[in-house]
Amino acid sequence: MSQTENAVTSSLSQKRFVRRGKPMTDSEKQMAAVARKRLTHKEIKVFVKNPLKDLMVEYCEREGITQAQFVEKIIKDELQRLDILK
């Protein structure tokens, strides 16, 4: 196969799926993202004291991580420390 044929074949197989019809609204996109996230994650809701939350936000911004990543890390670290998670 020549390079030209190879390029055409690879570009055809890598085409993006184009959604036909009316574009999704921002809220529909958000709902779809949450639905995908729920397939692999569970939601937790907690109330923490304001100073702790403020410190967490500062730390996350400084480290370039999300608050969810921070919470997952401290839960994982504590479960490993307790020998619950290996």
From Swiss-Prot:
GO terms under biological process: plasmid maintenance
InterPro entries (alphabetical): RepA2 (IPR019661)
Disulfide-linked positions: none
Regions annotated as coiled coil: none
Biased composition (Polar residues): 1-14
Protein purpose: This protein is involved in the determination of copy number in gene replication. It binds to the repA promoter thus inhibiting the synthesis of the mRNA for the initiator protein repA.
Transcription regulation listed as a keyword: yes
Any one GO MF annotation of this record: DNA binding
Species of origin: Shigella flexneri
Protein name (database record): Replication regulatory protein repA2
Keyword annotations of the record: DNA-binding, Plasmid, Plasmid copy control, Repressor, Transcription, Transcription regulation
Pfam families in alphabetical order: RepB-RCR_reg
